[in-house]
Amino acid sequence: MQILLANPRGFCAGVDRAISIVENALEIYGAPIYVRHEVVHNRYVVESLRERGAIFIEQISEVPDGTILIFSAHGVSQAVRNEAKSRDLTVFDATCPLVTKVHMEVARASRRGEESILIGHAGHPEVEGTMGQYSNPEGGMYLVESPEDVLTLNVKNDAKLSFMTQTTLSVDDTSDVIDALRKRFPKIVGPRKDDICYATTNRQEAVRALAEQADVVLVVGSKNSSNSNRLAELAQRMGKTAFLIDDATDIQEAWVKDVNCVGVTAGASAPDILVQNVIARLQELGGGDAIPLEGREENIVFEVPKELRIDAREVE
């Protein structure tokens, strides 16, 4: 049985930065460190940080005065940010810079009095944070998930209308929604550059190449990870059997029985150790050496806040 690895796969720059912020805060300030929401959507990462002293909460009221609070990579609304400011807390922001870019687009639209439409999944923390950047009572902020939602959407003034997208969506599905928006609201304005982040786009492109060769695709990622779910859906859409798994223990022998080629990828919040464990399990089930496919090289790095740079503190 051949094992192919999608390239790129796994951690993106925003996830790397968010995890480093929590790890460095624990090292510098000591436990406990409070984190609003799971810092990234991966069970292994969250449990590892919890064991080191991170406490994951959903409400700012759960955080004691005089402690450290970190916002997750998904971002928070202005209301949450203001609530944290009103408290005696030291706050660090692990929001992915590419999510912050979308926040700024919404805030600009709000200041200009434009109505805004966000393409995204209801209930996802990134969506809640992005929707919460809009504050103009004269305008409006709307959420759509599908072309069908666009057909039933009513706005106040379609001459002053803009759209943004969640960063972890399906590229294909989002394109369909944007087409529907432009058809329904011809004057709508979108971002200069697509809001779907480079890592989401690259990993979907990579899983497309993987699914062309593999009989079965395993996506390493947690069930609440938006970008991981999109990878599994894309492989399935290409006619391949695909499974979203937290780790190697989820693999069932029947999935790969009599299979010639298994493809493995990982969502942007899944660490490489989980991929290595999956490879080891597949090799126990008859797999050969893992062969990485060619793909886009990623060199993007997002710096952690200066106060949390371990190297800088050591130099001082």
Curated annotation (Swiss-Prot):
Can you tell me which residues bind [4Fe-4S] cluster?
A: 12, 96, 197
Keyword terms, alphabetized: 4Fe-4S, Iron, Iron-sulfur, Isoprene biosynthesis, Metal-binding, Oxidoreductase
Q: Where are the transmembrane segments?
A: none
Which InterPro entries does this chain map to?
Answer: LytB/IspH
**Keyword Ligase attributed:** no
Q: Which residues bind (2E)-4-hydroxy-3-methylbut-2-enyl diphosphate?
A: 41, 74, 124, 167, 225-227, 269
Cofactor list: [4Fe-4S] cluster
Q: How does it assemble?
A: Homodimer.
The similarity annotation says:
Belongs to the IspH family.
The entry's protein name is 4-hydroxy-3-methylbut-2-enyl diphosphate reductase
Supply the source organism's classification: Bacteria, Pseudomonadati, Pseudomonadota, Gammaproteobacteria, Enterobacterales
Q: Gene behind this chain?
A: ispH
